[in-house]
């Protein structure tokens, strides 16, 4: 069966090996015996009290909403849910891209749910959240890449939750940047986040379909239009990059006026995904954090378990996050 979007069945989600077929650089499935052993600093303590976790999951199921925490198999799910924060994933749970580092399913998405913005706003109100992160799958099938739906969500959330802070973690809106950015003119977030993910020489393998310079330009153009709103980006380490590669990406981000940074360890979601090439020790994350601050980032959350939205509320308020 071909994996070209036009020949996919709408609503059918491809995972793991099915998702990885026909990407530019073939991913050879890992052998368990050759996997790098997870170091002690990557071990996570799970809370024995899952009451809050179950409450949030129930609220998501009730309103047919998705969290990237679950869809991307984030290691911090329990901690964040118990903290009372969640990153909501809009526009469905099927992505039109098939990045081999990501655990979100690929396929032909269903039509956009026009009621999702209101359902999302009501869920956030019921959960009494003060800070939310809204992200999405890539929707290359939509004329604006889903930007207007983001804006609709921001507007509806603010109507029911006037004191809330909203961070959006957007896709690259490739081929439709101006159209996408125009959608946010009346409904702005408190933080605009778009992840570069990795060094440019790894893009063909790690982010097929994406373009490093395009992503930098997206961050820069939003900042030019809205200089008072912080821009943010994130990177994974352990995919074959060097620390010098990372430092160059940080330099590029600052050259494009990005204010906030997240830097965390890549973890392999399944044997069919890209393998971890190295586990970066906490001391190196600390050093990279120091260099990031020296380059002029207002906030730099650098640590093995840091993810784009990990304690995003604390980072946005200026607190140190590791």
UniProtKB/Swiss-Prot annotation:
Binds 2 [4Fe-4S] clusters per subunit. One cluster is coordinated with 3 cysteines and an exchangeable S-adenosyl-L-methionine. InterPro entries: Aldolase_TIM, Elp3/MiaA/NifB-like_rSAM, LIAS_N, Lipoyl_synth, rSAM. It is found in: Cytoplasm. It comes from the Bacteria. PROSITE patterns: RADICAL_SAM. It catalyses: [[Fe-S] cluster scaffold protein carrying a second [4Fe-4S](2+) cluster] + N(6)-octanoyl-L-lysyl-[protein] + 2 oxidized [2Fe-2S]-[ferredoxin] + 2 S-adenosyl-L-methionine + 4 H(+) = [[Fe-S] cluster scaffold protein] + N(6)-[(R)-dihydrolipoyl]-L-lysyl-[protein] + 4 Fe(3+) + 2 hydrogen sulfide + 2 5'-deoxyadenosine + 2 L-methionine + 2 reduced [2Fe-2S]-[ferredoxin]. Its EC number is 2.8.1.8. This is Lipoyl synthase. The gene is lipA.
